[in-house]
Amino acid sequence: MKNYYTTLSEEILSVAKLEKDTIPLRRQLFYIRLSKLEKSLDTDDLKKTFWINIYNAFYLITLKETKQGKEIFNLKRIKIARAILSLNDIEHGILRKYKFRIGYGYITNPFYSDFIKKLAVSKVDYRIHFALRSLNLAQKTIDYFDSEVIEEQLTTVTTDFIHLETEFDEESKTIQVSDFLLSYLKDFGGKNSVKKLLERIFERDLKNYKIRFKTYNRVEKLL
């Protein structure tokens, strides 16, 4: 049986992508009971599914309604279980297990609310960073995340993103990757782990290559 809350998250993302009215669905989110949400999202796969879909839906909704740039990530406009969250709360508090936005992922923020701590994942999955930026991919292969196949979806979106956003300079032996991999380096396991990830995806030996980071901006790419 499908999980009610992940199904609701799938629906609101689908409607937001079509730029249709999401207010009835947002009302349902607001009146969810925290105890039921916590009990229902009892695995990391369910948590990742629900919160990635909610994040991407409200990214689109907030961008459309406010017409703002980078400020949208701090705006408290996401009303769930009578709590009000920002995109940053979901990304860094829930999906990154209450980390500071800065600090490369090495510093935990003890000041997040009990609401966020109750709903946070038990283990950080570096692939969520690609899932939260998947709306900006030129070629989109995933309509929404589904808890029954989320492992495969996260692997797919990671592979797609890296193939599209990574540049090789064979002459200088350098690889340019999006700078959010540096910003959240600990989530990826460090610089060596980033290189191993690239080696797996491109199926080649990159030990003689240097990694360089290029600016990546979600808002500018969507506007």
Residue ranges, per PLM feature:
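Interaction/scaffold regions that mediate signaling and macromolecular assembly across diverse proteins
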Residues: 1-223
